[in-house]
Regions:
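N-terminal secretory signal peptides
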Residues: 1-33
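Long, histidine/aromatic-enriched segments associated with O2/redox biology
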Residues: 3-8, 32, 37-56, 63-451
Length: 451
């Protein structure tokens, strides 16, 4: 919930849902191509090969922005000016993992990024990792793909890669020849009031965000990238997420979080190109940061909700803490879900209808110098703790142009004055990563950093 722009703005005209781009043969239910089916098409010539190319590549304009798939197509293009998985319509499932780089050799790190790029190109198209996949390699060697997604399609998988501060330096010493290349905006996040961070759930040199509509597809992707990185990286932390807590397109409905409220009503959308340029895409403040063109900064926060306490809170108090009705998501000042909150409207006794310490007021752009962010978080649950309380909450993910202006001030204010954040939430994990622009065909993730 923290950092969530609950304060809604009136929506522009609802964009029509994208039309179907692929109709026809499918060896899987629902009219979608399986991984084996894609290989079959790839092996054909002439018109069939052209169909496969159109299915996998889309047109050049669409690919340049790494957009969502057309209609029911399970493939999201990997290449583009921006990485997929940022403005892509949010999928249903998440598996995100941070890695520590264990190799000390620059050439091995570069080769890993090339190998990851090659694997990501295959996985996001619904193909196995490696030349021989899960079953076509030699019996005396481990398979190049783990195989649990053999019978599944791409599932709208996106893989988004980022670099943490630890990639650039460790204990004050530059790593991998990257002295002076750490972006100024890639700061060490400050300690916020109420933080109870677990170091084992925080930080990391590299991060990979895998989002898909099928959880097995997302897990398969992270598992295979970790396998490819064996000996060069090790997993520092990972998190599974379900039930997106924001929409990134006007074609999507507003989801609910584990408090039962609609979440992310005023989130930035892919249709808001001007606002994305202003609030999401990074701007290089110096020549050394030119490799971040088309990129962004990923803020990750694991936020545990005090579920049992919340469940004993009255409906009226819950709505006052949020500043919205639980049913429709309308602001307490009146209207519908997308009605702009009226923070000056008063009720009986002259009290504001939207409380001064409510989440919607504290997170609203008018209270934060007009700052917006693109949220892409997910609900999570990790069983229960030792006293029988659910370990559940929000895995908060936001993409911003600069965390110094677009995350830290808002989070600091909310950690001090948002009663919801103070009494019902606990931050247990944290990370900040520089997400470079999209990889071009023939290139690799973050290649500009190593040029």
């Amino acid at each position: 919930m923290t950092g969530c722009p609950f304060g809604a703005r009136p929506p522009e005209a609802q964009a029509e849902a994208p039309t179907d781009a692929l109709k026809g043969e499918s060896p899987t239910p629902g009219g979608r191509l399986s991984r084996r089916g894609l290989f079959g098409i790839a092996g054909l010539g002439g018109a069939a090969a052209g169909l496969a190319a159109g299915f996998l590549g889309h047109d050049a304009v669409a690919a340049s922005a790494a957009p969502a798939p057309d209609g029911d197509s399970p493939v999201v293009p990997f290449h583009g000016d921006h990485q997929a998985g940022i403005t892509t319509p949010a999928q249903d499932r998440l598996h995100i993992a941070a890695f520590d780089v264990t190799t000390t050799k620059r050439e091995e790190l570069i080769q890993l990024l090339k190998d990851w790029t090659q694997a990501a190109e295959a996985l996001t198209e619904g193909r196995p990792a490696g030349a021989t996949g899960a079953v076509d390699g030699p019996y005396g060697a481990p398979p190049e793909d783990t195989g649990e997604a053999l019978d599944l399609n791409a599932g709208k998988l996106t893989l988004t890669f980022g670099f943490g501060a630890g990639l650039f330096e460790q204990d004050g010493v530059a790593r991998f020849g990257l002295d002076g290349r750490r972006p100024e905006a890639l700061i060490d996040l400050p300690h916020f009031p109420g933080d109870d961070l677990d170091p084992a759930r925080s930080g990391g040199d590299l991060v990979v965000q895998a989002c898909a509509d099928d959880p097995q597809v997302a897990v398969h992707a992270i598992r295979n990238l970790a396998r490819i990185g064996f000996g060069k990286v090790r997993v520092r932390w990972s998190q599974l997420g379900f039930g997106r807590t924001s929409s990134t397109s006007r074609a999507q409905h507003t989801p609910r979080n584990l408090f039962g409220f609609k979440d992310g009503t005023a989130n930035l959308k892919v249709e808001d190109e001007r606002l994305l340029d202003q609030h999401v895409w990074a701007r290089a403040s110096r020549p050394e940061d030119a490799w971040m063109a088309g990129g962004s900064y990923l803020v990750a926060r694991r936020i545990r909700m005090h579920i049992e306490t919340w469940d004993r809170t009255s409906l009226g108090e819950q709505e006052g803490l949020i500043g919205r009705t639980k049913g429709t998501g309308a602001p307490l000042s009146g209207g519908e879900e997308f009605t702009e909150p009226d923070f000056n409207r008063q009720g009986k006794g002259g009290k504001p209808l939207i409380p001064l310490d409510s989440h919607v007021r504290m997170a609203h752009p008018t209270q934060n110098n007009g700052v917006r962010m693109l949220r892409r978080g997910y609900n999570y649950t990790d069983g229960s703790d030792g006293v029988g309380h659910l370990d559940a909450g929000l895995f908060f993910i936001a993409f911003v142009t600069d965390p110094r202006t677009h995350y830290v001030p808002m989070q600091m204010a909310m950690a001090k004055g948002d009663t919801l954040a103070v009494e019902y939430l606990k931050h247990t994990g944290s990370g900040l990563f520089a997400v470079p622009g999209g990889a071009k065909p023939g290139g690799f993730i973050g290649d500009g950093l190593f040029a």
